[in-house]
A protein has these predicted regions:
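Active-site-proximal N-terminal segment of extracellular/periplasmic enzymes that hydrolyze or transfer
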Residues: 34-97, 147, 477-485
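Histidine-centered active-site microenvironments of extracellular/periplasmic hydrolases
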Residues: 75, 270-285, 329-382
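Catalytic-site neighborhoods of secreted/periplasmic enzymes
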Residues: 106, 111-231
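Substrate-binding rim/cap in mid-to-C-terminal beta-strand-loop elements of soluble/periplasmic
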Residues: 107-108, 298-303, 324-328, 332, ...
């Protein structure tokens, strides 16, 4: 990893300050650039805040429109709907870096990560997912800041990618617990002889999927082995996660101020909800379970589309139920009036729109990027308040710390959103950037435009996409060819955002100097 001098970083800060109004990532960005601390971690200062507790819940792949507050008329989420009624609702949260691990880096630090530089996919070595790696040496996490302010900090997570060997997302937590078995976690030994998957998919689809993705059967082999093992302990993994969170709350709620950070991988695929939630959305589920949606464009028959959508909705309802168990426990313990509750997600998923499912660098559209952000304050302060305008995940750390009367690290590039809540200031961000790998999307109130931001490293051909959000709010019809002046303007915005962060988003990994 290239090192940058403090003088270089100061120059970068000046350049970034000039671009901040265009990309609008943060009011703190220029100062933050000059505080990029070389190759070492700097301990957060000792601080005294107001000692409010924080319960932060992140559910992976949770679309905003799963909730009534964001327009749901199908998915049943009564517990989160109740939380929304008591919360500040941020209307337009879109991630800066995607998917899973890039977003967790932003959530942990409050710092922008795009453009990305490193490429560690899994524990076996380099992969093809830019930004998918552990925290930098220099990063200062929310948990580290709170520990120095006297907090007890707990991370309870079933997200398998956080648990990979060498990952360090537990930094700053005085307690962490990994719940095993999600997706391709190395949790159960798959059989040497590939099982019969005819109960999962029709034979024609299974053949097409295997031809499109030679590793598909291997994936199914590990997933089904994992599922067989974790079903011994409950109907879903989020059940185990929530039960552990409830246990931790009962044992530690009176230990002083605390941060309880809960990470649920559900409703991330594979989509295999308990039958009692699936039946809410599909009375006749058919002979095939369709647990894993296709990442490629495959010929999914109508019955497969119906089952996949019902599977996803059932997963979301199951997550809601178990989050409800955590929330009701907090209420039982008398925590609702001295605790800040936060619910959000990293990204959403396509459910057959434009013939596509899940997410990818070719589908940075509303269904993937629009996610919920609910913040419930003690005494239901500002309950039901809707905050318009674009916000991003890096705003959460400074916003939370502000409500705790604590100062964020100088490395934070996000913005405290409180003035937008109180009306002291209006949100002036005219656009935000969301990136998936080497592709970035510029979202404005009128348009959503996506294109390759690193043409040197992107492999393959990518045709820029443009969606007219006024005429096409679901972003289904690409109109890039009809609007060259719009694409040119938005491409310039994307280029400025990338150039403004080129040095700010660098860091170092585990360097040892003797």
């Amino acid at each position: 990893m290239d090192r940058t001098t403090r003088r270089d970083l100061l120059k970068t800060g000046a350049a970034f300050a000039g671009a901040a109004n265009l990309a609008a990532p943060s009011a703190r960005a220029a100062a933050t650039a000059s505080e990029n601390c070389g190759s070492h971690w700097e301990r957060p200062p000792k601080q005294e805040g107001n000692n409010l507790n924080v319960i932060l819940i992140v559910a992976d792949t949770f679309r905003a429109d799963n909730l009534a507050a964001y327009g749901s008329q199908w998915v049943e989420t009564p517990n989160l709907n109740r939380l929304a009624d008591e919360s500040i609702i941020f209307d337009d949260l879109h991630p800066e870096g995607m998917p899973t691990i890039p977003t967790r880096r932003v959530l942990s630090t409050g710092r922008r990560i795009v453009p990305t530089h490193a490429f560690f996919q899994h524990e076996t070595g380099p992969g093809a997912s830019p930004g998918w790696h552990h925290l930098y040496n220099e990063d200062v996490t929310l948990a580290e800041t709170l520990v120095e302010a006297g907090y007890v900090t707990a991370l309870i997570a079933d997200l398998p990618h956080l648990q990979r060997p060498g990952r360090n997302f537990h930094r700053g937590y005085t307690y962490w617990e990994w719940i095993r078995g999600q997706e391709t976690d190395y949790y159960a030994q798959p059989p040497r002889v590939t099982p019969d998957f005819s109960r999962l998919y029709p034979a024609e689809y299974l053949m097409e999927a295997q031809q499109s993705n030679p590793g598909f059967l291997s994936f199914l082999n590990r997933y089904t082995a994992n599922r067989k093992r974790w079903l011994q302990y409950g109907d879903s993994i989020v059940e185990q996660t929530a039960k552990d969170a409830v246990r931790w709350l009962r044992e530690n709620h009176d230990q002083g101020p605390f941060l309880l950070h809960i990470e649920s991988f559900d409703p991330h695929e594979p989509w295999d909800p308990p039958d009692y939630f699936l039946e809410k959305y599909l009375k006749d589920p058919g002979p095939h379970s369709w647990p894993e949606p296709p990442y490629q464009r495959l010929n999914v028959p109508p019955e497969g589309i119906r089952r996949l959508r019902a599977n996803y909705a059932g997963e979301a309802s199951n997550v809601d139920y178990w989050i409800g168990q955590v929330l009701s426990t907090a209420e039982e313990l008398g925590l609702k009036e001295n605790t800040i509750f936060v619910f959000t997600s990293d990204h959403g998923a396509l459910l057959g729109e434009q013939g596509q499912f899940v997410k990818g660098d070719d589908r940075i559209r509303k269904q993937v990027t629009h996610v919920p952000l609910l913040i419930r304050l003690p005494n239901r302060q500002y309950a039901g308040k809707r905050v318009a305008g674009f916000v991003q995940h890096f705003d959460l750390v400074p916003t939370l710390l502000g409500r705790l009367n604590l100062k964020p690290s100088p490395r934070v590039t996000g913005e405290d959103l409180w003035p937008y809540v109180t009306g002291e200031r209006s949100n002036r961000r005219d656009h935000v950037v969301s990136a998936f790998g080497y592709v970035g999307a510029v979202r404005t109130p009128e348009w959503n435009y996506s294109a390759v931001w690193n043409r040197e490293k992107y492999k393959g051909h990518y045709q820029p996409q443009l969606y007219d959000r006024k005429k096409d709010p679901d972003e289904l019809v690409d109109v890039a060819g009809q609007n060259p002046s719009v694409t040119e303007k938005l491409q310039a915005n994307l280029d400025r955002y990338i150039s403004s962060g080129w040095d700010i988003t660098k860091g170092t990994f585990n360097e040892i100097e003797l």
